[in-house]
Each structure stands twice: as C-alpha cells, then as structure tokens.
Amino acid sequence: MTKEKLLNAQYISVQFFKAIEENNLIIAGKSEEQLNSEICDLALNRFGIEKHWHKKIVRAGKNTLAIYPDNPPNRTIEKDDILFIDLGPIVEDYEADIGRTYVVGIDPRKLKLKNDVEAAWYDIRDWYQKQTTLKASELFQYAVAKAEESGWEFGGEIAGHIVGKFPHEQPADPQSLELDIHPENHNDMFLPDANGNERHWILELQFIDRKKEIGGYFEQLL
C-alpha cells in the first residue's frame, strides 16, 4: 500500500510540474524567490498542496552548483539560463520528492546537461531494478560513473534517500547516513526497516560543469 501511495504522490507532483510549464512560470527576468513563491501559490490553488516535507528549491545559473544544505543568494533567471526545481510535496500524508531541470533558451551545452542527467536517471533505475542486494555506496559510485561517462562531474553529496508516509523513518543516530545513498553507507538498500517493511528510495542526480558554473538535476522515486 505504501508504494501505491508514494506513486500517487509522485503522479500528482508530476502533474504539478507540468502545470508550472503550462503556466509559463519559468521566464528570464524573474528571480528565484519570485518563482518559488508562484510555485507555492500554484501548488495550493491548483492542487491543494499545503505542506512540503523539505525546503522548496529553485536554483538558476551558478546556483545550480549548490548542494541541498546550501542557501545561495537569490538570483535572477537570465536569457539562455539553466535552472532546476526540487520540491517535496506531501500528498494525502505521503511524501513525494521531484526534481527537474529547465533551460531558458537554446544553449546546446545546457540542453545536453538537462538531457544527460535525465537519461542517466533512467539508466540507473533500470540497473537498480535488476539487483537483489546492493550497498547504498555501490549505487552512489555507479551514479558518479554515469556522470563521468557523459562528460560531467557528479555534484551531490548523496544520490538519494528514503521517503514514506510523512514523516518518514529517521535513523536512531541523527548523524547516521544509513538512510541516504552516500559513499559511506555500506548497508544493503534492500534491507527492511525496523518494523520489517520495505524501504522506498528516491534517486537524485546532480551533474555539473564546474568550469562553466552550470548544473542539472533529476530526482524521483526509484
């Protein structure tokens, strides 16, 4: 039942992202903060989404190099810019976690980055689904290799984490990495939780070109 609820939360969230595009909210000359505010209004007014389980992220230009804990200065979307949006809506008490990249313009390098990070997500998903046992650290290293295979650097500290009914499971030790896809988490991702239930993982990819100061992002439920 949990997987079905999570898939429903993701489905609603994907429709939400489509509405962001259909309403032409992503345009040059708009600040990240303004776009974030408009996204929140759309979530509430169109989809009845009031709560998000993690901070709402809109990052453009060089801010796309920032990792989740960072809080870079507000930036204005420019012509031929790249940006990504990372949202964690709560839908009927279940968590979604969706990230998408957008390119304002036709810059070929940025379009390649957008396409490569999305294609890599599905390649990794297909590989993951063939496994019956897998350390989180092994998936992280596989994601790093996929980034390098496409000519990018892997920009994130993690390559994912668990989700569930809000609030999702937390480790007994707040400093533990056991519920993150992290290079130092050598636990099997297929292990059940403390109650014997299946864990559900988000795969998040951030590919970057540090020299050109651009990053691409794609995230959703494995």
What do these predicted ranges mean?
Residues M1-L222:
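Active-site neighborhoods and metal-handling regions in enzymes and metal-associated proteins
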